[in-house]
């Protein structure tokens, strides 16, 4: 009789994964943020959720309204967060002036976005710890792993968005008492720079996750989710070094970092 494999118990059923296997497959959960949850945060959402080894990811905007360019600088297209889908925006702009919005890239951007998730969400309306199982049911890319409504890393794409996120987290009162690393990667708000920024954010995510996996292997993952334990403490201490090494490779994307609490 053949001996059971590493993934099979003696009775032929699937064996529970070992701690080492769990560490190898561990993924940090990410949140990407820009002003309108349209261009920069969604390009990063795409990169993270469709990477060869994808990450759990959610995304938001920090503006009061979703603003997209219109026929002139004084005539933007304005929408509400949380209630207007990317598909609705696409259909409206298509019917208004297909040629204009095709040429300026908005229709292509909205096509990408509606294949990632339902619609733009506002960061200030997010309640950390509130379940997001409906986003899994909707088929949002990156939703698996974010059902619990918590993330480990928030990456904003503009300094004013970083300020808004940090202020909002303080105002929410850290009810979960759970640490979260908040980065800003400064990306100009155009399609070309968003592509570059998305690639850079994915590299930062990979570096952070590699360090997290190493620490969980070396020091046990006990207490990790609560921000306690040797593995978590060691990882948190290494984050500034990881960012500094990343910044050397991406000097044109100035970055900020702070440790905050959900």
From Swiss-Prot:
InterPro entries: RNA_pol_II_suA. Keywords: Hydrolase, mRNA processing, Nucleus, Protein phosphatase. Its main location: nucleus. It is found in: Nucleus. GO terms for biological process: intracellular phosphate ion homeostasis; mRNA 3'-end processing; positive regulation of telomere maintenance via semi-conservative replication; regulation of pericentric heterochromatin formation; regulation of siRNA-independent facultative heterochromatin formation; sno(s)RNA transcription; termination of RNA polymerase II transcription, exosome-dependent; termination of RNA polymerase II transcription, poly(A)-coupled. It catalyses: O-phospho-L-seryl-[protein] + H2O = L-seryl-[protein] + phosphate; O-phospho-L-threonyl-[protein] + H2O = L-threonyl-[protein] + phosphate. GO terms for cellular component: chromatin; mRNA cleavage and polyadenylation specificity factor complex. GO terms for molecular function: protein tyrosine phosphatase activity; RNA polymerase II CTD heptapeptide repeat S5 phosphatase activity. The keyword Hydrolase applies. Residues 1-21 are annotated as: Disordered. It comes from the Eukaryota. Its EC number is 3.1.3.16. Component of the cleavage and polyadenylation factor (CPF) complex. Component of the cleavage and polyadenylation factor (CPF) complex, which plays a key role in polyadenylation-dependent pre-mRNA 3'-end formation and cooperates with cleavage factors including the CFIA complex and NAB4/CFIB. Ssu72 is required for 3'-end formation of snoRNAs. Belongs to the SSU72 phosphatase family. This is RNA polymerase II subunit A C-terminal domain phosphatase ssu72. It comes from Aspergillus oryzae (strain ATCC 42149 / RIB 40). The gene is ssu72.
